[in-house]
Structure formats: structure tokens, C-alpha cells
């Protein structure tokens, strides 16, 4: 299966934002206290308020994994309902249990499977994307073209990625902004951790574009 990049346009009528690792409902102090909150409820409320302050209902919010932890399906649906944005695209992270129930109940049974091994109808590749309500599941990896610019998105940062030799960007999360090579001020790649711990809000395409202009195009492989 050959999958074309997803094309999006950022303009005054429709803006594109990116974030990762919100960890809604995470009940461990090392998450919410590090972000300046007393408990998970205060943490949830603050993150929802900030998202709604930045992202409009008509915009697109692309979330690169680890949306939430330790949450029941009703709690998950409540948080999702409180986020005003009506178009949230989701990349799988490594903490998927909270969103897995929603996915299995509403999505998995409707996905097409490309079978290439084994005898089970579930042996194969899930064909993305699939949308249910305001959530679109994009799988573990996706290539985007936003305003004509190539962006590779996934949860985990990678040193080498498609089209990097032509100036493509990579957006990721996972490290909670502890990896210096994926931070704003690191000059020697066009890779950025868009996670909440680094920015405290979703980043817009123009904000990311400004950051990437200050990063060097470094060729890491032989595709020069």
C-alpha cells in the first residue's frame, strides 16, 4: 500500500497545531507537580483551558501520542468533549491504554485489514486513517504536507527520516523535552519535540516554521 502525505493548509480560516504528551489524568506527582499543579484534576483543567485558549473549534490539532493515562472510558470522553477543537488527529504513543478502549469500541472493527500472513482475519496491517467523532486515528507514523512543506510526524524522535535531505522537518514527542537534540535551541537538525513539557501549549505551524528557520539542514545519510 502506497500512502500519500496528508495535505493541510494553515491560514486565517483554518490553523494547524501540534502537541504531544499531555498525559491527561496522570495521577503521578512527577507529571503534574513538574508542570506546577497540585493534583491531576487541576492539571486536567489547566491543560484543557490552554488548548481551548489557543486552538479554535474549526482548527486542526495534531496530537503525537500519550494523550492520557489511568482513565476510564467515561472520563476520556468527558475530557475529549471539553476540548473545543472538533478535528483532533492522533498518532499512537507508548501509553495507549486510556485511548485503546475508545479505539477498540469505535474504530478497530471498522478498519480494513491487509492480510499478508497467518490464517486469522486479524493478521495484517490496519489501514488508516479512521475518524470517529472529533478524533482521527493516523496510526504510528504519518507524513504531512502543510502549506507545501513536508513534515514527518511520529511519537519517537529518529535521527534519520524521509526527505530530510530535502529540508523536511520531523515533529515528535516522548522525551518530555529532556533530549537536547530535539529542543528549540539545538541547531544541527530540523527535529522538534512538540510535547507539552517543552512549550506548555500547542504550537502552530508558523511558530514551528520560525523555529525551524533557525535550525541547520544537516545531511545525516547518503541521500544528498
Place the predicted regions along the sequence by residue:
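Conserved beta-sheet core of the metallophosphoesterase superfamily
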Residues: 108-222
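Core catalytic region of metal-dependent phosphoesterases/phosphodiesterases
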Residues: 17-19, 24-138
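A generic local structural motif
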Residues: 3-4, 47-50, 74-79, 138-140, ...
